Structures are given as C-alpha cells and as structure tokens.
UniProtKB/Swiss-Prot annotation:
PANTHER family xrefs: TRANSALDOLASE
The gene coding this protein: tal
Provenance organism: Streptococcus equi subsp. zooepidemicus (strain MGCS10565)
Locations listed in the record: Cytoplasm
Protein task: Transaldolase is important for the balance of metabolites in the pentose-phosphate pathway.
Pfam assignment, any one: TAL_FSA
Biological process terms in GO annotation: carbohydrate metabolic process; pentose-phosphate shunt
PROSITE patterns on file: TRANSALDOLASE_1, TRANSALDOLASE_2
Keywords: Cytoplasm, Pentose shunt, Schiff base, Transferase
Annotated catalytic residues: 83
Protein name stated in the entry: Probable transaldolase
Family: Belongs to the transaldolase family. Type 3B subfamily.
GO molecular function: aldehyde-lyase activity; transaldolase activity
Main location (coarse class): cytoplasm
Matching InterPro entries: Aldolase_TIM (IPR013785), TAL/FSA (IPR001585), Transaldolase_3B (IPR022999), Transaldolase_3B/F6P_aldolase (IPR004731), Transaldolase_AS (IPR018225), TSA/FSA_arc/bac (IPR033919)
Length: 214
C-alpha cells in the first residue's frame, strides 16, 4: 500500500518525507489556500521534495476551463497529477485529458457509480472520501471494497486513493480492503508512529540500561 501526504505545508512534507514512507502528495484548493502562497510555486517545491505523484486541483467548473487549466498545471512537473471534481463536466475533462496522456485524480467520490464513471472516463486515480461518508452515516468501507472488486473484475487501471482520512483506524481499514493508497493529513502521520506502550517500554529499557551501566 502507498501512503500519500494530504497537505501543502512544505516544511511538514520535508520532515515527514525523511521517514521514508511517503509515496506522493495530494492537495486541493482548501489546502493550498491555507498556505497563503502562490499555487504553482508550492506545487513545484513539493515536487522537488517527494519523488512521486503530486495532485494539484483545477478550480474551473466547465470542461473547457478544467481542460485548459489542467494542461497548464501538467507542465509544471512530470510528477503532477491533475485533480478533477466528480461532475459531468469533470468527466468530460477527464476523458479529453486521459487521451492526451495527462494523469488525473477524480475527487469527491461518494458512490460506486461515481467511481465507475470516473474509471470509464480514463481516470488515473479515484478518490472516495472516508470521513465525510461516515459523517452522514454511510459505510465508506463497503464503497472501498466494491470499487476494488470492480477494478479487479474488469481490469481497470485506476488506483483508489482513500481520502478524507482522519484516524489510524481509517488507514488500517482501507489497507485491509485493498485501497491502493491512503492520503493522510500530516498530523496523523505522527500519531501513527506512537503508542503509550511503545513510549513506556522504551523508557523502561533506557532506565534498565542506565542502571546496568552504573
């Protein structure tokens, strides 16, 4: 399974990338806006840190706007993946872009039919949202399972990026269900390395070693 970082904070990306577990990065307009910096500059900086797919999202609403913006974004770096919203206009754009060899990540997927449509249109990645589905009482895990089953059954080349990840339990569950990728907020990465028993165990080891060295 691959781990992507869901952030545009360059310093956080640089620090977490040193762990050797980061395979890519995802961003969206909300994440970019929180940084208060130029969109293109941020994406290019991220591409220099992480050697993997870097998702950058369009902001246009029509297919024509998305296509024009995507063509421009795709030129920023070979690792850039253009993020497209799951709408009818987004599907039109994805179809055109896929034929041009531009990698796409179709986002805001909440149903199997949406995921299937995105894959049919040629999406490189599809991003179902875990936390947001839980917020409305829906079962995000069934969605992941169903989408993975469809990919395996029909041979679609798209990969599932489990998004809207909020807890380590989310990561563990989607890993078991066959999501190819989990995109994880930077604060959660730190929490996933920690456990009180690990901390206490290390403390005991060090205390015992200090006593022995005396």
């Amino acid at each position: 399974m691959k781990f992507f970082l869901d952030t545009a904070n360059v310093e956080a990306i640089r620090a977490i990338n040193e762990l050797g577990v980061v395979d890519g990065v995802t961003t969206n307009p909300s994440i970019i806006s929180r940084e208060g910096r130029d969109f293109e500059t941020v994406i290019k900086e991220i591409c220099e840190i992480v050697d993997g797919p870097i998702s950058a999202e369009v902001t246009g609403l029509t297919a024509e706007e998305m296509i024009a913006e995507a063509r421009s974004i795709a030129k920023w770096h070979d690792n850039v993946v253009v993020k497209i919203p799951m709408t009818t206009e987004g599907l039109k754009a994805t179809n055109v872009l896929s034929q041009e060899g531009i990698k796409t990540n179709v986002t805001l997927i909440f149903t199997v039919s949406q995921g299937l449509m995105a894959m049919k249109a040629g999406a490189t990645y599809i991003s179902p949202f875990i936390g947001r589905l839980e917020d409305i009482g829906a079962d995000p895990y069934q969605l992941i399972s169903d989408l993975r089953g469809i990919i395996d059954l029909y041979g679609f080349q798209a990969e599932i990026i489990a998004a809207s990840i909020r807890t380590a339990a989310h990561v563990e569950a989607v890993a078991q269900l066959g999501a190819h990728i989990a995109t994880i907020p930077d604060p959660l990465f730190a929490k996933m390395t920690e456990h009180p028993l690990t901390t206490n165990g290390l403390k005991t080891f060090m205390e015992d070693w200090a006593s022995f060295k005396k």
